[in-house]
Amino acid sequence: MNNITTYKNAKAGRMIPESYDALLKLWGADIKELDIFGRYGTTHVIETGNQNMPPLVLFHGVGDDAALMWIYNAKELGQHFHVFAVDTIGGPGKSVPGDGYDKSFYDEIWISELLDKLGLGKIFMAGVSNGAYLTQMYTIKNPERVIKAVSMAGVPVKTSGNSKKAAMKAMMKVFLPEALFPSDKNVMKLIRKMTGSNYTAFTNNETVFRHFKQLMTGFKRSAMLNHKVIGFSEEEIFSLKDKLLCIVGRKDPFIMLGGAELEEALKQYPLQVIFMDDAGHGINHEKAAEVNKLIVDFFSDGNL
């Protein structure tokens, strides 16, 4: 029997879902919450937007959830799309891992099964951070199903034997030491470290700030270890040429760690990449209006 839990203790298991619900009230949109059962457990999905418009499936990052990730995007995107915001299974949202969620877990199978059970055929897809990776991976593996995709705070990474080690090293550089001692002061410092000048998108909204802190203190990150991040071949990255838009911030600490070398490396691929000078890892919060418009405009050329 699977004994994976996503929260560190019972208190976190109560408080995080409560503040999740408080965030949903701030979306300013009509929503429906769905629980989709599958081979890996129950995946929670927030449905919103215009049901007569094309489907847009959204994925958040590690240690995050759909309620927080799309708080500044869902209402506007819902004017143009039938939105399905997914809580990653193993993450701190309302998805619940089942017996099948083990080392054999495979993101592509999970997403395909979820889309099938939602009755979705061809879709638009967008994601942030790890959600950007999921978006890139699924678009590469299922080009016939993904019309177009947008990845934010994440760019396609070429296959490398050291990629996992490098990713862990980058995570430690960014999150430590603040994440070890998540007081209000340290959470504020971490937010400032991860964002550009509009860090107030996280700090001036008390509900957003408290939920962010609760995720830092109460989410058991080991619950995500069954997710595997696999680099792509050059051929796979080239296949994204006409389908993928990458939106990244120059103040994103993960992008900054790559430095000029990352930008030079990206130039060898025919990818559509937009750099925002004063945005960080929370780019869709920090620059919500601009990001919303970029997504809508990029997808407006797609055809079902």
What are these regions (language model features)?
Residues G41-G93:
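Conserved HGGG/HGGXW glycine-rich cap/lid loop of the alpha/beta-hydrolase fold
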Residues I140, K148-E178:
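Flexible "cap/lid" loop of the alpha/beta hydrolase fold
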Residues Y269-L304:
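Catalytic active-site module of serine/aspartate enzymes centered on a nucleophile-bearing elbow/loop
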Residues F84-A126:
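Active-site loop/oxyanion-hole signature of alpha/beta-hydrolase fold enzymes
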Residues S160-N162, L180-S239:
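Conserved alpha/beta-hydrolase catalytic His-Asp/Glu region
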Residues G127, G131, T135:
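Gly/Ala-rich beta-loop-alpha elbow adjacent to hydrolase catalytic centers
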Residues M1-L56, H80-F81, G121, S300-L304:
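Alpha/beta-hydrolase fold catalytic core
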Residues L245-A279:
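Conserved loop-alpha-helix segment in the C-terminal half of the alpha/beta-hydrolase fold
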